[in-house]
Amino acid sequence: MRLSQMLFVTLRDDPADAEIPSHKLLLRAGYIRRIGSGLYAYLPLMWRVLQKVSQIVREEMNATGAQECLLPQLQPADLWKESGRWDTYTKAEGIMFSLIDRREQQLGLGPTHEEVITAIARDMIRSYRQLPLHLYQIQTKFRDEIRPRFGLMRGREFIMKDGYSFHTDEASLKETYQDMYKAYSNILRRSGLAFRAVEADSGAIGGSGSTEFMILAEAGEDEVLYTEDGKYAANVEKAVSLPIDAETSRFTTYEKRDTPGTETIEKVCQLLNCSPTQLVKNVLYQTVYDNGKTVLVLVSIRGDQEVNEVKLQNELTKLASEYGAKTIISLNVPNVEAQQAWTTKSLPLGYIAPDIADEYIAANKQIHSKFLRLVDQTAVDLKNFVTGANEAGYHVVSANWDEQFKLPERVVDIRKSRPGDRAIHNPEQTLQSARGIEAGHIFQLGTKYSQAMGATYTNEQGEEKPLLMGCFGVGVSRLAQAAVEQSYDNDGIIWPVAIAPYHAIVTIPNIKDAQQVEVAQKLYTELNQAGIETLLDDRDERAGVKFKDADLIGIPYRIVTGRAIANGKVEVVERATRKSQEIVIDEVTTTLQQWITAAIDVKN
């Protein structure tokens, strides 16, 4: 392609609304164009990158025996109501775009396709002889993000590969899960990316287990905790660990202490000269279920620990049926204004004890009359601890469970693991932290959707059984931007060779020099005929502008038909290393073929 004929406009300055390097560079280099909040046009260079990523994904999926298809983006609400996720996606998380058609039928723009594929399986799979089966698609998805940001990282429209598998038993499901683990590792490796596979929370998708594939980058939204022995890695939302040991309490006699102005852990520890590891803090949450029922949740946890709200939400979702509900609509720490809707009197915030009286909750049929009390294991293990006295300005010291306070019935793991914690598999290993961009996620769904939607098959004994399912997603457009976030410098993008829009760019420093133009045309033709995807910068611009643009767009190899042609050579510059060398004109094609093959093969 000739740049003079291409839609190619670069920017010298960073766009004001771009926050992270990859977003800035893709806009500046003319790869994408913002159309609206969270909405981007993929311009010609970007579309080539996306096609290459998609092809790698397609090859790896096909190699496992998965079959490509294409599912409708518009989905009937009735299918989502069958699975029980309509309210979760339109009210709780609120990420699904929903609409009503002219027949007054509710529809959703698909953020994911579990319901559609399960309905297809329900209608078409009859016998165990048809299983296992794995279908996938590469398609545009939609999410009504609260705050779209970071370009293609968190947009309202994005390209994704999503696959769904069906099985007769756990062994078959796990085999496909492992196949996908290998395939996803291959996809990222072939794309030239450094990544880490980590244990993950299954979120609204559900299922018994899942793994995320994190592209390592400082701008990543996710925190990954891992051990240096390589035996443990998890998203912080899912991570488990051993906290530091609690210090021995300095208190031996139970008593109430005057502690004015100590609403925070730090202040009470300073006043009482004690460690936060010897304090039980009690955090109040307000959760609303999909049937409108509000439940007040009191979480007791060791003073130096933080509540993992993803783990907490999972625990509360498990309890939904006890309140006549299916799922959670919202979970938050209620502010004073929110508390006024259900309290009979002001709460002693900062001084709440594990036994705060249920009488604080006003009588209301939409509000559960008692606090749901949960305790983290870190608090259960404490002796002679400090905690609130249910009275503003006072704490108690040397308290114990089953003496001064009844231990809550529900003991749960809801603490947030953090760097420095000890690993469970080997306490001598401590957790390290890294930032990551989630590029892929694989799930073992089990029968979550098949049971809810009546998708069954007949086994060898003639019995009707629910299908076991797996679900596997790769963010194609996110992966492409993540590659930029992982590899750039002050001058622009450094694309991995395998997914670069073009392998090489031939730059003519002076288009008025007939010899430069002739050599450039010759190389441009030869390289493309040899399968080396090549751009020709034949614009009437200064050489410096062309060199800067070549660096900005990140094409792996730049060939310059400058002064060296007098000696039968051209200058070839490798973008990643900036190494420059002069190569005989007739040897350029074979040399680049070798370099490109080596760069791609090293990732396979």
From Swiss-Prot:
Origin: domain of life: Bacteria
Q: What is its main location?
A: cytoplasm
Gene name on record? proS
Share the domain note from the entry: Consists of three domains: the N-terminal catalytic domain, the editing domain and the C-terminal anticodon-binding domain.
Which HAMAP family does the entry mention?
Pro_tRNA_synth_type1 (MF_01569)
The enzyme's main class, written as a single word, is ligase
Query: Tell me, what does this protein do in biology?
Result: Catalyzes the attachment of proline to tRNA(Pro) in a two-step reaction: proline is first activated by ATP to form Pro-AMP and then transferred to the acceptor end of tRNA(Pro). As ProRS can inadvertently accommodate and process non-cognate amino acids such as alanine and cysteine, to avoid such errors it has two additional distinct editing activities against alanine. One activity is designated as 'pretransfer' editing and involves the tRNA(Pro)-independent hydrolysis of activated Ala-AMP.
GO cellular component terms attached to this protein's record: cytosol
The record lists the catalysed reaction(s) as: tRNA(Pro) + L-proline + ATP = L-prolyl-tRNA(Pro) + AMP + diphosphate
The record lists the organism as: Nostoc punctiforme (strain ATCC 29133 / PCC 73102)
Tell me which Gene Ontology terms the entry assigns under biological process: prolyl-tRNA aminoacylation
Q: What is its EC number?
A: 6.1.1.15
User: What are the alphabetically sorted keywords of the record?
Assistant: Aminoacyl-tRNA synthetase, ATP-binding, Cytoplasm, Ligase, Nucleotide-binding, Protein biosynthesis
Q: Which family does it belong to?
A: Belongs to the class-II aminoacyl-tRNA synthetase family. ProS type 1 subfamily.
Protein name as catalogued: Proline--tRNA ligase
Query: Which Gene Ontology MF annotations are present?
Result: aminoacyl-tRNA deacylase activity; ATP binding; proline-tRNA ligase activity
List the subcellular locations.
Answer: Cytoplasm
Outline the subunit composition. Answer: Homodimer.
